[in-house]
Amino acid sequence: MQGGRIGRPFRILVSTVNRTIESALRFVNLTAAGLLAGSLGFGKAALVPGWTDELPRHDGEPTPVAGYFNAIGPVALGTAVTLAIGASRGVPVRRLLDSAAAVGLAGVLAATIMVTVPINQELEAQPATDYPSDHSQTLVKNWARAHAVRTTLGIASFVCAVAASNIRNHAK
């Protein structure tokens, strides 16, 4: 090291390690975001924290793998934020797509935790009736809207993550 400068071999090693870490983060991000988008679009319960509260369990037993599923949303969000902040500065569009994916995944988690789970808990607390009240119908409509928003955000985030991972660095 001369005059505070990093030598060329070390710079190549750091670049390779950063690309390797970025590739691993992109793999984890794509996997988690894809599972999350799939669970939102096609499943009965979204794989985000609170999903066990969305569908009641009649036997009272906790879901044995709920801990693993609860981690999918936060892992997708964490890797998206890490990629948006720490990814290489090669292509600006990639950083923009990583940022959009992170914002979308944050929206999915926020809509789930702050809207759909409280609505489900309120609906569960209501006594069974022959005809639904106006209030419960309003809650169901609000839940459907929030679910549509979080599904759209989840799928859009996955599309952004796929697009960001397919952008190649251009040779200078």
Residue map of PLM features:
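Glycine-rich, hydrophobic membrane-spanning regions of integral membrane proteins that mediate transport
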Residues: 11-20, 53-61, 89
